[in-house]
From Swiss-Prot:
Biological processes, Gene Ontology terms: positive regulation of phospholipid biosynthetic process; regulation of DNA-templated transcription
Source taxon at top rank: Bacteria
Classification via InterPro entries: CheY-like_superfamily, OmpR/PhoB-type_DNA-bd, Sig_transdc_resp-reg_receiver, WalR-like, WH-like_DNA-bd_sf
This protein's record includes keyword Transcription regulation: yes
Domain Response regulatory, first and last residues per copy: 2-116
Organism: Pseudomonas aeruginosa (strain ATCC 15692 / DSM 22644 / CIP 104116 / JCM 14847 / LMG 12228 / 1C / PRS 101 / PAO1)
GO molecular function annotations of the record: phosphorelay response regulator activity; transcription cis-regulatory region binding
Family annotation (SMART domains): REC, Trans_reg_C
In-chain residues carrying the UniProt-annotated modification 4-aspartylphosphate: 51
Protein's name according to its UniProt entry: Two-component response regulator PhoP
DNA-binding region range list: 124-222
UniProt note: phenotype after gene disruption: Deletion leads to loss of expression of the outer-membrane protein OprH which is part of the response towards Mg(2+) starvation.
């Protein structure tokens, strides 16, 4: 699972990053709301852990902003404030659960797992754009209900472009998604993969949803739902 941790205390942030990573999660750990909003605009997340006492924009305001943007992933509050009013305000803002500092990691882990289990039945399972349906569970693309034979990397590019539909996506961002640990990878690989993906989609009834924006990247032109 991809988790977002928003915590301004550096030691605690590092501890959560390390321990949650040891549990098999991919963790984005950031110190403030501004960086958190940037990360959620760029990447998919399955759950967020947010400290209420953030510098600048507060944790409560961050939660409200995420919900106003339509972000539906579960949110767990971390707070040093133990009174009932803070908990009520957090839940009213859109959080799903809370843990009061100081806490045992095992308690946090149990609450996170419970949130993930409860939310699993409500996670979007498809993305649709015109005749194209992306089945997120089966990792499969269909055009006019007919499967499109995509490689794993072609599928990942298509999913990323559809999740960021009607936004220009730079080749560098696609490189980060496909090869996060390979800084030497030639960016021309992306051009080859996108070219193959286009040909496969076009072969299915002439569907052409991916445009090239010269000097900037790629644009999935169809509105997704």
């Amino acid at each position: 699972m991809k988790l977002l941790v928003v915590e301004d205390e550096a030691l605690l942030r590092h501890h959560l990053y390390t321990r949650l990573g040891e549990q098999g999660h991919v963790v984005d750990a950031v110190p403030d709301a501004e960086e958190a909003l940037y990360r959620v605009s760029e990447y998919h997340h399955d759950l967020a852990v947010i400290d209420l006492g953030l510098p600048g924009m507060s944790g409560l305001d961050l939660i409200r902003e995420l919900r106003s943007q339509g972000k539906s992933f579960p949110i767990l509050i971390l707070t040093a404030r133990g009174n009932w009013q803070d908990k009520v305000e957090g839940l009213a803002a859109g959080a799903d659960d809370y843990v009061v500092k100081p806490f045992q990691f095992e308690e946090l882990e149990a609450r996170l797992n419970a949130l993930l289990r409860r939310s699993s039945g409500f996670v979007q399972s498809t993305i649709e754009a015109g005749p194209l349906v992306l089945d997120l569970n089966r990792k499969q693309a269909l055009v006019e209900e007919q499967p499109v034979a995509l490689t794993a990397y072609e599928y990942r590019i298509l999913e990323y472009l559809m999740r960021h539909h009607q936004q220009v996506v730079a080749k560098e961002r696609l490189m980060e998604q496909l090869y996060p640990d390979d800084e030497e990878r030639d960016a021309n690989v992306i051009e080859v993969l996108v070219g193959r993906l286009r040909r496969k989609l076009e072969a299915c009834g002439g569907f052409k949803p991916i445009d090239t924006v010269r000097g900037q990247g790629y644009l999935f032109t169809e509105r997704c739902r």
